Amino acid sequence: MAFVKTEVQGAVEIITIDRPKALNALNPEVLADLKAAFEAVDQETIRCIVLTGEGDKSFVAGADIGSMSTMTKAEGEAFGKLGNDVFLMIESFPIPVIAAVNGFALGGGNELAMSCDIRICSDNAVFGQPEVGLGITPGFGGTQRLARLVGMGMAKQLVYSALNIKADEAYRIGLVNAVYPQAELMENVLKLAGKIAKNAPIAVRNCKKAINSGISLPIEKAVEVEEKLFGGCFETHDQKEGMACFLSREKPKPKAVFTNN
């Protein structure tokens, strides 16, 4: 993979988009590498993923305008589908994904961050959907995920105006979960990833599935999804071990595999 690098720290994998000279901008090759990186994750041992960009200026500054400038309608639609396919894969990936936003997260960069479960940013981060200023719409889910995260009115304001916002405003409107000084970002992201990784993996996976599946359903159907996933945790090693240790006041030892047994 020419534009993405990976590093494993215990049960946490760090996936880094590595195109700093272009501010980690997305093009078809970067998207293909990102897809390959997620497909290569060892789901038997990894319990949390951290996604970030190389350098201290940019998470992902957007899609590569140079490569888009000559696209036809058909090519533009195909590029949108490529990005959406990759981002949907990340959004539905069984393992939790934290976006460590270390600078610019504009256009496709903001859309990529929004496809992650949790967004934590540095104090120099900048977010926005500037596409209408370039004569296009957001193409990788920006009009959809932004409204779900910050509400329809705020999403429309940001998209229609092409306004960029700083880290503190992104936190205020609920786009990010936390803001840290640049030098402390990865330390705090990895601390959270470690806390997630220590919990029972089957239960964490089922929680992600329940939230993602249920959010678009009527509450009556959504709780049915939760019921099945709740029931699916029983008779697993983690459930037996966790409850036995709770009752005996011992520290539980969640199993490192994701199979129900």
Language-model region placement:
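Crotonase-fold acyl-CoA enzyme core
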Residues: 89-202, 235-236, 241-244, 260
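Terminal peptide-recognition signature
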Residues: 15, 19, 33-34, 51, ...
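Conserved CoA-thioester-binding segment of acyl-CoA-metabolizing enzymes
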Residues: 1-52, 88
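Glycine- (often His-adjacent) and acidic-residue-rich active-site loop
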Residues: 53-89, 105, 135, 218
